[in-house]
Amino acid sequence: MKPLSPLTLSFFLFVFITNLSLAFSNEDVEQVLDFNGNPIFPGVQYFILPAIRGPAGGGVRLGRTGDLTCPVTVLQDRQEVKNGLPVKFVIPEISPGIIFTGTPIEIEYTKKPNCAKSSKWLVFVDNVIQKACVGIGGPENYPGVQTLSGLFKIEKHESGFGYKLGFCVKGSPTCLDVGRFDNDEDGRRLNLTEHESFQVVFIQAEANDAEFIKSVV
């Protein structure tokens, strides 16, 4: 049998190490599913709801907070029967069109107020409450306030049931979970946190869905 050349051996070693690294790095990666067990797809409308319904409140929507003149802050409704506004997920990079846990995504509402330039989620720093909060729009909606560029992601929740959202700052290795903060406003703010994450599920929104839904748990 003809012996393999050093170049061929190097190639096979490279392929082996690469595949081994991918196997380990993707060990905990899985396709994101909605509440009914169906795969989540980009461009489809979903409601983001708490995994456990009740006093935890309802879905997420938009509201006006602090000194902002436009309702661009993402809030969780206090009423458990409210499903909020549907969102859609966008994969900004070339992909097979499948959302896995950890996939960098953009999140955007399917409707927005006229005073907001964009319906895409972003993060802004509220200096009054010293929190990095989730909102929509652009820098013009947050005069004198720092906004952070980056991408969101979906991960399995630590409890093993449902998911959590995360945000990774552009150009930085920093990624934080999305949690909730109660500032005695019209709803609970979604904010970046190193502590308790917001445990959520995704329910596909039908074209004729009303504002109210039944409890999922």
Swiss-Prot record:
InterPro entries tied to this protein: Kunitz_inhibitor_STI-like_sf (IPR011065), Prot_inh_Kunz-lg (IPR002160)
Residues bearing glycans: N191
Alphabetical list of PROSITE patterns matching this protein: SOYBEAN_KUNITZ (PS00283)
GO MF: serine-type endopeptidase inhibitor activity
Cysteine disulfide partners in this protein: C70-C115, C168-C175
Location, primary (coarse class): secreted
UniProt KW keywords: Disulfide bond, Glycoprotein, Protease inhibitor, Secreted, Serine protease inhibitor, Signal
Domain of life: Eukaryota
Reported tissue expression: Expressed in roots, leaves, epidermal layers of elongating stems, meristems and in the vascular system.
Signal peptide, first to last residue: 1-26
Family annotation (Gene3D superfamilies): 2.80.10.50
Subcellular location: Secreted
The keyword Secreted appears for this protein: yes
GO cellular component: extracellular region
Primary role: Might act as a protease inhibitor involved in plant defense responses.
Similarity comment: family membership: Belongs to the protease inhibitor I3 (leguminous Kunitz-type inhibitor) family.
Protein name: Kunitz-type trypsin inhibitor-like 1 protein
